[in-house]
């Protein structure tokens, strides 16, 4: 048993594409459940939207603008009462490229 003050692992995932994010979450949930740990989540967190407005032309026509946006999708997972087998399996897990993972014990 992983000896911590609170017996949970909190995993926060971020990605620009929600489809690969959901695949990564599904892999983590399957791995945790197969090793005997309980899983709370995935909890969808608010999406960060970064908007950038630029002029279409260089020096003229200020009314003609274009907007671009970048969305960062986030999910939160809690793995309750993880065993050593769970920690080892999560360490060996290969997630898709483009998924940022933060782990708090």
Curated annotation (Swiss-Prot):
Listed Gene3D superfamilies: Ribosomal protein S10 domain
Alphabetically ordered keywords of this record: Ribonucleoprotein, Ribosomal protein
Keyword Ribosomal protein: yes
Keyword DNA-binding: no
Cellular component, GO, one term: ribosome
Segment forming the signal sequence: none
Example GO BP: translation
Functional description taken from the UniProt entry: Involved in the binding of tRNA to the ribosomes.
UniProt family annotation: Belongs to the universal ribosomal protein uS10 family.
HAMAP family associated with the record: Ribosomal_uS10
The protein's name: Small ribosomal subunit protein uS10
């Amino acid at each position: 048993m992983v000896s911590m003050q609170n017996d949970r692992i909190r995993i926060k995932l971020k990605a620009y594409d929600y489809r690969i994010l959901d695949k990564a979450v599904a892999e983590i949930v399957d791995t945790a459940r197969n090793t005997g740990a309980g899983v709370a989540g995935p909890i969808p967190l608010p999406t960060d939207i970064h908007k950038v407005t630029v002029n279409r032309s260089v020096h003229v026509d200020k009314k003609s603008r274009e907007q671009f946006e970048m969305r960062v999708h986030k999910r939160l997972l809690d793995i309750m009462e993880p065993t050593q087998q769970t920690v080892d399996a999560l360490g060996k897990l290969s997630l898709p490229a483009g998924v940022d993972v933060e782990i708090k014990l």
